[in-house]
Amino acid sequence: EQAFLRWLAHTAECASALILNGDVFDFWFEYRSVVPRGHTRVLGALAGLVDRGVPVSMMGGNHDWWGGSFLTEEIGVTFMQDPVVAELQGFRTFLAHGDGLGRGDLGYRILRAVVRGRLTRWLFGRLHPDFGTALGARVSRTEYREGGPSDAERGRSKAVRTWALAELQRDPSLDLVVCGHTHIPLLEEVEPGRYYVNAGDWLHHRSYL
């Protein structure tokens, strides 16, 4: 966390905008008047960036897709639940977290559809915040690992890369496809001036774009 806070402080000095491409939090759910305990310094740093005139956008990832009005109204973050196409530094960019893209992992796709459904969100909101937050944190907890990427991460990386290359081929107006989710950084020039980039992760690689 301290390294991330130092990086945010540096960002405040030199960035014109900041886009966080999902899974900033291991678990996030906003009840009507309660948010998960913790993340205080990170949230304060993000609010500080916004107060200094640096726009902050956050793409919901598979761990923190349930963002809402606390992030947007109290912190000032623009929260996005779905992929977007935007002009970034002269590049027409497709920006997505990356979960659910590519072939395979049918079980996760089904779970993702259920978890993102309105009924699931409503039902989860009926749980007591202490129980709901503990349950969500337990299910979505990211384990710190030693060594290289796991087989599952390599599989996700391959699937998302294959999807991204196909998307660049399908839409010639795109210059850049940016994803996360896989935890494996990657920069690939598909053809002159057109790229697929995976920002990797902060926990293991301290990587960013």
Regions found by a protein language model. Give the residues of each.
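Core catalytic region of metal-dependent phosphoesterases/phosphodiesterases
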Residues: E1-L88
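Short, surface-exposed, polar/charged, turn-prone segments marking secondary-structure boundaries
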Residues: A12-A15, L46-L49, V84-L88, Y108, ...
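A broad, low-specificity signal for short, low-complexity segments enriched in glycine/proline
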Residues: A17-L20, R41-V42, R52-M59, G136-S140, ...
